[in-house]
Amino acid sequence: MSAFRDQRGFTVAEVLIAAAIVAVAFVALGRIVPIAGYAVQEGYQGSTATFLADQKLELIKDLPWVSTPANDCLGISASATAAPNVPAGATCTLGATTVNGGNALPWEANENTTAITNFNGYSRQVRVTDCGSGAGCMGIVDAGMRLVTVTVSYTPLTGVGVATAPKSYFVSMLISQQ
């Protein structure tokens, strides 16, 4: 019988203390999981926005903008809020499509949150600045250069739901006349 008396186990107090420590750890873990999920979602949305901006820039950099024969399919934005138009006195011929001066270029039109196939919730804008007027572009004053900026916006998630304001990513590229 004395062999049973020498064996010791956990006391009720020790078990309660261990249970309390484990409970605190689970509560802390429960608070971190939503924040980690938000961080993954934010990374996904930011990567998608950058991809969509780069995708549009790839399309734009292949557009014809040549002086002889005159063909301007890159266009110029009249203001920071306007999509590019063919400059007055110029035309754009791209495949079977011809756009006269002063008219909008369909491939550079603003795209709302339902216009980008397979990417609902993202909007995209293209702005083209003439580097030959005013202060130029990033210190470059040259009529043969234009600054193209593609901005992609979306409404991000936060740690507690959907944000109240959209978030935007933009990518810019200088393009020279061919």
Predicted features and spans:
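Low-complexity, Gly/Pro-rich coil/beta segments used as flexible assembly/activation regions
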Residues: 47-178
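Aliphatic-rich helix starts adjacent to a transmembrane/signal segment
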Residues: 10-54
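N-terminal leader/signal peptides at the extreme start of proteins
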Residues: 1-10
